[in-house]
Amino acid sequence: MSKDQKSLILMLSNSQHSINRKFANELKHSLSCELIELKDYQVDFYSVDLEATNFPDKIKTLVRKIKEHSNLIFVTPEHNGFIPAFAKNIIDWMTRDEQYGRNQFLKGLNGVICCVTPATAGGGKTVLELLDKFLSFSGLNVKGTVLVNGYHENFDFKPFIEQVKKLI
């Protein structure tokens, strides 16, 4: 499969029983694509001092893996209106990778941002809007967002998977 056809799902939850992980796994099987768990790339919290002395190899590896794809699907829970702190930290580190230019590690890539939440209030919408701006700043061409709200047991993800397919 050429880069032009490759999609990658980035799971931004570190919760073992994440409803977003259920959605990401269904997406993975439906799209026949790779899924990367950001929790497998956890590193110390970013600081300028740490960057100057010890840029994490894990982050360089992750950025290289991302750059092998043309379409990214971010699947995230909502934590107080934004993504989980550990995921924000990993993205912060990736923006500092000099190989692709500061804040440009997503340049030339297309993306879809998804959030699954049991709530019906505005937290999910807020995280999608903020992550859209945050990732666009790093060069991502955000094709759209998919909000799955009102999640409950035995939920049918199929209509939302179809939305993602139309966007990538």
Curated annotation (Swiss-Prot):
The keyword Nucleotide-binding applies. Transmembrane segments: none annotated. InterPro entries: Flavoprotein-like_sf, FMN_Rdtase-like_dom, NAD(P)H-dep_reductase. GO terms for cellular component: cytosol. Keywords: ATP-binding, Nucleotide-binding. One of its GO terms (molecular function) is ATP binding. Coiled coil: none annotated. ATP binds at residues 119-126. The keyword Nucleotide-binding applies. PANTHER family: CHROMATE REDUCTASE (PTHR30543), NAD(P)H-DEPENDENT FMN REDUCTASE LOT6 (PTHR30543:SF21). This is Uncharacterized protein MG342. It comes from Mycoplasma genitalium (strain ATCC 33530 / DSM 19775 / NCTC 10195 / G37).
